[in-house]
A protein has these predicted regions:
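An acidic intrinsically disordered interaction segment
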Residues: 2-12, 96-106, 153-161
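Active-site recognition of the HExxH zinc-binding catalytic motif
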Residues: 103-119, 132-136, 140
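Acidic/polar low-complexity interaction segments
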Residues: 1-55, 59-67, 71-91, 115, ...
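Short pre-active-site segment immediately N-terminal to the catalytic Zn-binding motif
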Residues: 40, 88-105, 124-126
Length: 173
């Protein structure tokens, strides 16, 4: 199945799976006929953000499990973390499938990091705007770019969701 240590990708409540026979030596495998690019992008992005998080918090184990990631949900132009999974809408409304944008995957998993990390400390964090900013920090750290969500919009491949290098908000200025 398209499940690893840190993510279980599902479409229509099903996890992609297939069987292959491996021979001793080098085996060339492809998942192209058994999964789609939305599933593979989500799988790769979640593993990337989990590894990035562990480089800062190696002893934090709150997300050391296969987090469900649901792709191609009904709706459009959004994604969300619900406390137990990350969820991505199908293409529509002028937006690409949100699972295709790695920054969106990093951001949603970032909500999970923030949620589980605060819980591990015995607290909760419910500030909406700050939560969005903190989730963005995980994506910004991975991409090392102030522009998040490039490729989000169908009609503008260079369009983005947020940009942090224009009209900077720096305290105390």
């Amino acid at each position: 199945s398209l499940e690893g240590r840190w993510v279980r990708v599902r479409t229509n409540n099903a996890t992609p799976s297939w069987t292959v026979n491996l021979n001793p030596g080098v085996n060339n495998l492809t998942a192209d006929n058994n999964t789609d690019i939305r599933q593979r992008t989500t799988y790769h992005a979640v593993n990337t953000v989990h590894d990035f998080m562990k480089s800062f918090y190696p002893s934090f184990t709150g997300l050391d499990f296969a987090l469900p990631a649901n792709v191609d949900l009904a709706g459009n132009c959004n994604a969300f973390y619900d406390g137990s999974s990350i969820n991505f809408y199908a293409a529509g409304g002028g937006c690409n499938a949100t699972s295709l944008v790695a920054d969106v995957c990093y951001h949603e998993y970032g909500h999970g990091i923030n949620d589980k990390f605060y819980q591990a400390q015995g607290f909760s964090f419910d500030n909406g705007a700050m939560g969005e900013g903190y989730a963005d920090i995980w994506a910004l750290g991975i991409t090392d770019s102030p522009i998040l969500g490039i490729g989000f919009y169908q009609s503008n491949p260079t369009g983005f969701v947020r940009r942090y290098d224009i009209n900077k908000k720096v305290f105390p200025q």
